[in-house]
Amino acid sequence: MAEKKLWWQKPGFGIQYQIEARPGWRWNRNYEKFNASMMDENRNLKFNGPLCKMKDWVEFSRQIGVDYHIFEVKWHDGICYFNTKYTNWKTPEDYVQIYAEESRKARIPFMFYYSSIFDHNPQFDAIQPLKTCTPSYFTLRTTFILRKTLIQGFSFVFAIGAGILFKLNRIFRRYPKDKSAKWFDHFRFTPFKDDPKTYEIYMFNQLTELVTKYKPDGLWMDWYMLSLEDSAYKIMDFMEKKYPDVVLTFNDSIDSKLRWAHYTTAEAHDVKAAWNKGNRYRRNKSPWELIGPAANAWDNFLPRPDPHEAARMAAILMASGGKACFGMPAQMDGTLYAGPAGQLAQFGQWYKKRKALFQDATPMDYKGQKVPGIAVKEKHVKNIGCIHGNDPLIHLIYLFGVPRQDLIVKFCRKNWDALEKILLEPEQQELDFTKDALEITLTIPKQDVDQTDTILRLKMK
């Protein structure tokens, strides 16, 4: 009998609750201005949101049937959403305590997102390489004689590159530009003391706090940069030695062999990326995840123009053996943005009835981006193959558009001659098909074609 898999080892559907999505601010921001906007006259944090509605958020997770969820306890802005004793740059209410308690009541595995790579807490102003953009690397790995210049230059170039990627994403996906904020706002270089040790001590003190005080199921660290940056390696050693049972992952680690992590993860922001990456990682032997925004982008809160896109992304990734996680933005009063939340809720209701078809299945071991011996006449429909029990499952997923006619699927008899019966899941509705000397032809009536994922169970002789 196969060993029962733990939640992080199986395909699954997750949510990451975002706290960084703020009207009037981009992912890249000028922290001289941002931090000033968040301070009172004594330079203490004047917190104005999001006022996290933790009970509502956990209840949302429960209602839509997520398999796990994540909360951003400290993003790149450095604001801590928990009662830490190592800084006053923290929220008046201990949101993490409520999140942990409510997650346990709901029996939802919960993780903490923690930005290890950037932290714009003003208590680090003296050692902050760049204060006028988000990328600012404390722990860049370099022994170059002009180390401080290299750190600032690399951080600045990274901010430019990220801006180009955000712009291309907006152009290709055709969502409107947010004109209320600029990517760069009065950028400048400022003097700083090169002292990564101060930040590292702070970070490890907080990780110890988070694990011992709130006892999460896992830590989701942002992010991993191969050998360019030190913090990830030190976190691996720290967690392996002190807290090996706490699930650990690093953003952007999926193409690397980490010396200590429970699963790997990276980002996929649209259905095309999910399709390409899902096929790329489908044959991975270790657990993996891909994450993307539930809305248009991390800093754009409008719902995706295609209301089925996030659902199709999730189906692709889970059918490929991975976990699909979506960042959910909240308004300043803590209310989840209705558009993205509605799209995920719709998928959640669909997923509840089909959860076992994903979680208890194993991807077929084939090369390429289509199941051998299966052809679909509709060009926008792709297929993924799994094994569920003793039966092949074929997932038929529209990358674009909606069903407008009957869907014709052809099975080559050389590969599928033993095919005896085809059932439409989860209804177990038997579908008729025809055979000739070379092919088996299945015509799925338009009304039976699912807008998210049409799942066929093949019964073999």
PLM region descriptions:
Residues 2-461:
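Mature catalytic domains of secreted/periplasmic carbohydrate-active enzymes
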